[in-house]
């Protein structure tokens, strides 16, 4: 199996010591014995990729399941006890009784004529939702392939290459979701879909390019070998312009041709005044991010250790399960928060539903700062700390877009379902 070295160097056994002179080569030799192993080729990495502490990962999953069960119970109560009961009572009334009841309505039923009023900065919301779905799809598909063993550490760079490939391909989904959401908000108007598609193609990549360029200038200024070569920047720009942008425009075209989602109720021209709240609504939105963070903070430690401490991370099966649980928790959290806002007659739910789940990014960034202070003591100098914070910022922006898109779309479905069950003239 193994061939012997053709011309080994023989040492003179009579030479006990060797006099080493300056600027002269030093000759030495060694022996290597190759022993054929009975380990199969597909299993050659098992000894290095065996991850200890599986109980910790299972504890993380169990913790996430407890959070999901708690939120699912709240959603169950909302649907079966509150919503179904109110809808049943409402539909059993005749028209005269309904007219009288409309004057005595309270809670979410009062905002029926305002709940689908267009939000502020609708184009930005559509762009962020489209980019979020693209990032989420890329993460799920990449982790799935890694869990199935298609991306092995034996081939360096396969994980990053796979992420870039799936991200560019899923530009179709980003353009489709953003443009169709845009047409839904503007009641079927397809004008401006090209502009929305371009913004989707440029928003998140532009943020990433700005952060990476700034950090790369720091590396160039410190004469670091870790700086990204200029040629690689050119390649990334060409991939973005020649593949990602056209695919996003194609997705936007299909989104413009697809039928928009029709609102079940009409919107009044004059917006309804929102009653004063006891507590700021955004305070509740920011606090909602603690629940999604609780589902992934244990797994986050292993990921950060792999990125910054050089430890091997190959439990992609656990990571895939945690990612799915995170999506479920984000959907449930945003749905519950949206219902709570509607119950206090706050019809401005669009952005709040996005950030109810997207606020998990704030806690991840705070965790990153904590990890920098207490765990990454080997980092020296402000340049290293700036690089770490810059990459962490890029990561949390991606997480905010992905989780926010999940929360918004689940809330949109819930609100549409809720008010489509109410029959109003």
Predicted regions and their residues:
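Membrane-embedded alpha-helices of multi-pass membrane proteins, especially ion channels
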Residues: 68-82, 134-150, 170-183, 207-222, ...
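Extracellular secretory-pathway ectodomains of glycoproteins
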Residues: 266, 270-278, 289, 298
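Hydrophobic alpha-helical transmembrane segments
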Residues: 2-15, 103-113, 142-146, 179, ...
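TerminUS-proximal long segments
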Residues: 14, 18-19, 371-425
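Hydrophobic alpha-helical transmembrane segments corresponding to the first two to three helices
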Residues: 46-220, 253
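Interhelical loop segments of eukaryotic multi-pass membrane proteins
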Residues: 81-109, 142, 149-162, 186-199, ...
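Transmembrane alpha-helices of multi-pass eukaryotic membrane proteins
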Residues: 55-69, 122-134, 154-171, 189-208, ...
């Amino acid at each position: 199996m193994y061939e012997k070295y053709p011309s080994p160097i023989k040492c003179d056994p009579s030479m006990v010591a060797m006099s080493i002179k300056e600027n002269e080569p030093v000759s030495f030799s060694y022996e290597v014995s190759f022993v054929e192993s009975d380990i199969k080729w597909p299993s050659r990495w098992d000894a290095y990729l065996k991850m200890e502490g599986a109980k910790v990962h299972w504890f993380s999953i169990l913790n996430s399941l407890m959070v999901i069960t708690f939120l699912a119970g709240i959603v169950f109560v909302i649907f079966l006890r509150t919503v179904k009961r109110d809808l049943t009572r409402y539909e059993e009334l005749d028209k005269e009784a309904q007219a009288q009841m409309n004057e005595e309505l309270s809670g979410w039923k009062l905002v029926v004529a305002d709940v689908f009023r267009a939000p502020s900065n609708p184009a930005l919301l559509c762009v962020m939702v489209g980019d979020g779905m693209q990032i989420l799809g890329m993460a799920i598909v990449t982790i799935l392939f890694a869990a199935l063993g298609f991306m092995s550490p034996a081939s360096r760079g396969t994980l990053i290459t796979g992420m870039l490939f799936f991200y560019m391909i899923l530009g179709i989904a980003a353009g489709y979701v953003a443009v169709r959401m845009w047409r839904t908000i503007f009641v079927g108007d397809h004008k401006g879909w090209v502009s929305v598609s371009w913004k989707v193609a440029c928003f998140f990549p532009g943020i990433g390019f700005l952060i990476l360029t700034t950090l790369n200038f720091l590396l160039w200024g410190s004469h670091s070998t870790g700086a990204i070569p200029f040629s690689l920047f050119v390649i990334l720009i060409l991939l973005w312009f020649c593949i990602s942008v056209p695919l996003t425009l194609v997705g936007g075209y299909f989104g413009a041709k697809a039928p928009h989602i029709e609102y079940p109720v009409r919107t009044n021209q004059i917006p309804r005044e929102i009653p004063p709240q006891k507590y700021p609504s955004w305070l509740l939105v920011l606090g909602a991010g603690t629940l999604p963070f609780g589902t992934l903070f244990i797994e986050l430690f292993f990921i950060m250790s792999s990125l910054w401490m050089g430890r091997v991370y190959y439990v992609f099966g656990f990571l895939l399960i945690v990612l799915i649980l995170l999506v479920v928790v984000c959907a449930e959290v945003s749905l519950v928060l949206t219902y709570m806002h509607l119950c206090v007659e706050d019809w401005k739910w669009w952005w709040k539903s996005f950030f109810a789940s997207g606020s998990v990014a704030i806690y991840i960034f705070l965790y990153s700062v904590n990890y920098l202070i207490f765990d990454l003591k080997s980092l020296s100098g402000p340049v290293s700390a700036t690089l770490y914070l810059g990459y962490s910022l890029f990561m949390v922006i991606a997480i905010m877009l992905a989780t926010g898109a999940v929360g918004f779309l689940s809330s949109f479905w819930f609100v549409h379902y809720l008010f489509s069950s109410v029959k109003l003239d």
